[in-house]
């Protein structure tokens, strides 16, 4: 009878999940092939991992026996984030307020822009504090320009001065991640034009890392020390960073990645993590490169894994259950699990560091495809024990300067899309613990909840109302 009841309960849970998916996304959002890829067995595995790895047991004592106790989770240990590059740049007070509220109502982490060419456009002149082009009033005045026009005209577009953003994060309990100390794409012209020797160029990199570490200190919890440096066409058994994948014509000193981690290890404050970040995470050469760096002494604390889909057609293929996209792969559960398993061999926590999953079109169907895809992806990533942080990239549609993609949680008019509501359901409801319990004869309550901070309220042993704070780890 127990087995039968468990079986019926399992069927009931699957039916509820199917009903939720149908209600949220509609019957025709995804193909039967997609639903087979992400079917009940995959969802059950995800649920089991979430229960095992994202929850912990807790006991709270000191209540009057046999009385009601309310357990309420306040914060998550797990970091849910996005980049905050459009801070005060969205053209109206209402839009800017909605953008900021995302980081207080939905998310608890932010990636802060430190692109060298905009941070130090002239040698020695750092854009720490807000300037004339960092005010909401300025961006309100150019709101009619396209994202591409803003990017081409203003070095500050999607690159706001970081100090005010760090202040915003600190005031609102938002964990800040610095992106990035060294990134060849954002190398300032004054570095490139100086045409230094390799040794001199690496010296400039080291000095820049020192400046950032000293000025920012512990206001960020971690840095992408080097971003996207592996040479993609290098053999897996001999990975290197001699040519940047996006611009092979620009010189880069051989071995600069290792030198940068050497410098970061010397100057980053205690407790600030050194991350590496890369786009070609499905390719074996990236993880081979990270292992090579670590074998040569690089102190890499965090492995960043990007998952971008910069193509509407690829999203259509994903909805159809495709196993291959335009880059030779598609984000199927099996492929993602294989990538995470390979990353785990490095023995470091993984940061799902940049995510772009667009709606293939600006229609209810397109938004439903985006929402269901991200629901499945977030659930898989959240369930994986080595993943501790998930960062979405562009929160608002059509704010990325190179691609016309409806990839945000908000439409261009700051309307909350289906994906916002789906992730809000996961983060603020499904993955938050709220319980009504009764204290045991010894005055304690026991429960299993998601890791984070809690408020526990009831009647104390002295008969008076009491409130206790708790960290469930």
Please name every model-derived segment.
Residues 35, 215, 224, 229-256, ...:
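Aromatic-rich peripheral "rim/lid" segments of glycoside hydrolase catalytic domains that contact
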Residues 80-82, 107-112, 176-180, 221-225, ...:
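Hydrophobic faces of well-ordered beta-strands that scaffold small-molecule active sites
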Residues 86-88, 116, 182-184, 227-231, ...:
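Active-site-proximal loop/turn and secondary-structure-junction residues that shape catalytic pockets
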């Amino acid at each position: 009878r127990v087995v039968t009841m468990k079986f019926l309960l399992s069927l009931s849970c699957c039916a509820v999940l199917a009903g939720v998916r149908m209600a949220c996304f509609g019957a025709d959002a995804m193909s039967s092939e997609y639903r087979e890829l992400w079917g009940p067995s995959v969802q059950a595995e995800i649920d089991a991992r979430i229960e095992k790895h994202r929850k912990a047991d807790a006991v709270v004592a000191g209540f009057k026996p046999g009385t009601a106790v309310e357990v309420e989770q306040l914060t998550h240990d797990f970091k849910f984030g996005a980049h905050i590059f459009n801070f005060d740049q969205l053209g109206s007070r209402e839009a800017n307020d909605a953008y900021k509220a995302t980081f207080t109502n939905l998310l608890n982490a932010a990636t802060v822009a430190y692109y060298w060419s905009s941070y130090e456009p002239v040698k020695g002149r750092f854009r720490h504090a807000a300037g004339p082009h960092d005010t909401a009033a300025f961006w309100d005045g150019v709101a009619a320009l396209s994202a591409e026009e803003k990017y081409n005209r203003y070095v500050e577009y999607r690159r706001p001065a970081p100090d005010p953003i760090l202040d915003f994060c600190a005031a609102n309990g938002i964990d800040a991640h610095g992106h990035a100390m060294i990134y060849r794409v954002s190398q300032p012209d004054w570095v490139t034009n100086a045409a230094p020797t390799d040794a001199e160029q690496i010296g400039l990199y080291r000095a820049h890392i020192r400046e950032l570490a000293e000025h920012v200190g512990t206001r960020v919890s971690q840095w992408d020390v080097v971003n996207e440096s592996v040479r993609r066409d290098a053999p897996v058994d001999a990975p290197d960073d001699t040519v940047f994948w996006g611009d092979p014509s620009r010189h880069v000193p051989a071995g600069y990645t290792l030198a940068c981690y050497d410098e970061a290890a010397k100057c980053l404050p205690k407790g600030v993590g050194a991350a590496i970040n890369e786009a070609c995470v499905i390719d074996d050469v990236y993880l081979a490169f990270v292992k090579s760096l670590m074998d040569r002494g690089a102190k890499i604390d965090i492995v960043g894994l990007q998952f971008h889909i910069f193509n509407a057609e690829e999203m259509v293929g994903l909805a159809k259950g495709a196993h291959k996209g335009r880059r030779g792969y598609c984000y199927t559960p099996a492929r993602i699990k294989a990538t995470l398993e390979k990353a785990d061999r490095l023995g470091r926590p993984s940061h799902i560091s940049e995510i772009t999953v667009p709606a293939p079109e600006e229609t209810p169907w397109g938004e439903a495809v985006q929402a269901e895809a991200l629901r499945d992806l977030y659930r898989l990533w959240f369930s994986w024990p080595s993943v501790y942080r998930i960062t979405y990239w562009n929160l608002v549609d059509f704010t990325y300067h190179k691609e016309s993609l409806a990839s945000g949680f908000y439409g261009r008019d700051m309307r909350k899309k289906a994906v916002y509501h789906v992730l809000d359901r996961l983060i603020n409801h499904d993955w938050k613990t709220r319980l009504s319990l009764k204290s045991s004869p010894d005055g304690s309550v026991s429960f299993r909840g998601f890791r984070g901070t809690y408020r526990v309220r009831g009647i104390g042993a002295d008969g008076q109302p009491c409130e206790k704070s708790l960290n469930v780890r």
